[in-house]
Amino acid sequence: MVKLFIGNLPREATEQEIRSLFEQYGKVLECDIIKNYGFVHIEDKTAAEDAIRNLHHYKLHGVNINVEASKNKSKASTKLHVGNISPTCTNQELRAKFEEYGPVIECDIVKDYAFVHMERAEDAVEAIRGLDNTEFQGKRMHVQLSTSRLRTAPGMGDQSGCYRCGKEGHWSKECPVDRTGRVADFTEQYNEQYGAVRPPYTMGYGESMYYNDAYGALDYYKRYRVRSYEAVAAAAAASAYNYAEQTMSHLPQVQSTAVTSHLNSTSVDPYDRHLLPNSGAAATSAAMAAAAATTSSYYGRDRSPLRRAAAVLPTVGEGYGYGPESELSQASAAARNSLYDMARYEREQYVDRARYSAF
């Protein structure tokens, strides 16, 4: 079957008219008109060639029509993939097998599979129907339409249709464009068993040109990496120093000899509660110094009951004292005891009784 293209058809043309026009040269299987062009399927190839020779530029309803072989067929529709081929099979034997269904343009065997290019798409379809899942030289081969444009060997067709860049003149395995779409500066090594092999890495960790880039990828795991104790202590001290500078920078600088001597002293009492003097008032400074001297004696004494000197216990009748510094001294105890020795106020009992009995 041959498909013919008819162009520049007049509006008055009908399918029946076109069919009868081409049936003069052979059997017409199908006729379709689409707007100002159409397609005619003729069974015999010789009849199609005669129709093209006689009807091209034929005047129909005052318009010259164009008749030629249809060129809109897909290139992949004539390419067959033949799998599970016997290792003893040759190209000539496989070509002869497929020529039973039509002319074969090319036949190439690659290991246990092959690619066969038929001249016509209808012949390729007939070959699939007749040879798929059939025995050939002791093996059951599988025939189907090929959808791959990959050229795995120089002998498989012309150097056209690279599936990576779409340009002609080279096979895909020799294409300068890598799989990511960028131009590669090396020739990709082809592995027959596993396909294309990725080139090995040439740079180690940290040697990339983008490794030290300020705008590159962030290291989110830097805080979790193990660091030495000295590094951690130094980082903590630096952060504390920076925090103190930021928070104390707005406070005025106090220049005082008392404060300087206190800070420079090597023996600093942690319980000392001296108040910082004001540099603007000398009297206030003196008062603070006196208060500090008084409070230092209070905080400086030994407050442990075990190391304290034993107090003299008072005798009976002298009251209870709590040491020489207590307010309950012996004199106060004697004054308190004398109150019990005073004569009580005595009333006249009979007078009061007579007053209450009058009522």
UniProtKB/Swiss-Prot annotation:
Entry superkingdom: Eukaryota
InterPro entries: Euk_RNA-bind_prot (IPR050502), Nucleotide-bd_a/b_plait_sf (IPR012677), RBD_domain_sf (IPR035979), RBM4_RRM1 (IPR034897), RBM4_RRM2 (IPR034898), RRM_dom (IPR000504), Znf_CCHC (IPR001878)
A single GO cellular-component term on record: nuclear speck
Keyword rRNA-binding recorded: no
Keywords per UniProt: Activator, Metal-binding, mRNA processing, mRNA splicing, Nucleus, Repeat, RNA-binding, Zinc, Zinc-finger
Free-text function comment from the UniProt entry: Required for the translational activation of PER1 mRNA in response to circadian clock. Binds directly to the 3'-UTR of the PER1 mRNA.
MF annotations from Gene Ontology: RNA binding; zinc ion binding
Cited PANTHER family: HETEROGENEOUS NUCLEAR RIBONUCLEOPROTEIN M-RELATED, OS02G0815200 PROTEIN
Pfam families: RRM_1, zf-CCHC
Residues covered by region (Interaction with TNPO3): 196-359
Residue spans, zinc finger CCHC-type: 160-177
Annotated localization: Nucleus, Nucleolus
Name used for this protein in its record: RNA-binding protein 4B
GO BP term (any one): entrainment of circadian clock by photoperiod
SMART domains given in the database record: RRM, ZnF_C2HC
Assembly and oligomerization: Interacts with TNPO3, which may mediate nuclear import of the protein.
Domain RRM: start-end pairs: 2-72, 78-148
